[in-house]
């Protein structure tokens, strides 16, 4: 993630961004630095530079993912510091950019056993969207669940509704009516 995309891949991304815009799709480019981030100024600048490269390719929606990791990369205070830096030094300075999205390490209630979400709520810039899957990875979105997380992150969560997700049945095509989205939870 620290290195620029090779020219061929950069051209493909630029084409994807154009095609998405032509079809009224918001192309969100995400980076996942958590596995080996050092939390140094050098790494902050590396992420900032990658954002700049993507902006030059036409990307206007950005996300930083810290899901499915442990160790040094999973520290809420360090994540918030990096995200706040990107908010101030990039998102607020670039024209036409959507709000920054982050996927936290503890992105569902079953895995939220520490003060991680409370730290994000207290320290993360309120303009940054925080993704949330519900009470587990694949779960109904309920009013009770939304109220629980929103209190901790001190903002409405950015719902990552894992429906239908085929992680648990890769040999099936999931089709049929939607269920599990409480209409009262939409604006909770």
Spell out what each predicted region is.
Residues 1-98:
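Substrate-binding cleft of carbohydrate-active enzyme catalytic domains
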Residues 69-188:
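Catalytic-core regions of glycoside hydrolase
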């Amino acid at each position: 993630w620290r290195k620029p995309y090779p020219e061929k891949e950069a051209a493909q991304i630029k084409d994807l961004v154009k095609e998405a815009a032509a079809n009224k799709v918001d192309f969100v480019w995400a980076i996942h630095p958590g596995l080996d981030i050092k939390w140094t100024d050098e790494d902050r600048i590396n992420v900032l530079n990658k954002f700049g490269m993507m902006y030059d390719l036409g990307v206007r929606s950005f996300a930083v993912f810290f899901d499915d990791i442990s160790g040094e990369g999973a520290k809420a205070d360090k994540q918030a510091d990096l995200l706040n830096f990107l908010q101030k030094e990039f998102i607020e300075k670039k024209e036409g950019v959507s709000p920054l999205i982050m996927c936290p390490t503890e992105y569902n209630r079953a895995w939220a056993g520490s003060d991680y979400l409370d730290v994000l709520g207290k320290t993360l810039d309120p303009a940054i969207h925080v993704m949330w899957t519900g009470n587990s990875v694949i779960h109904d979105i309920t009013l009770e669940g939304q109220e629980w997380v929103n209190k901790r992150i001190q903002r409405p969560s950015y719902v990552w509704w894992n429906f239908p997700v085929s992680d648990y049945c890769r040999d099936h095509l999931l089709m049929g009516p939607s269920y599990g989205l409480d209409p009262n939870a939409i604006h909770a």
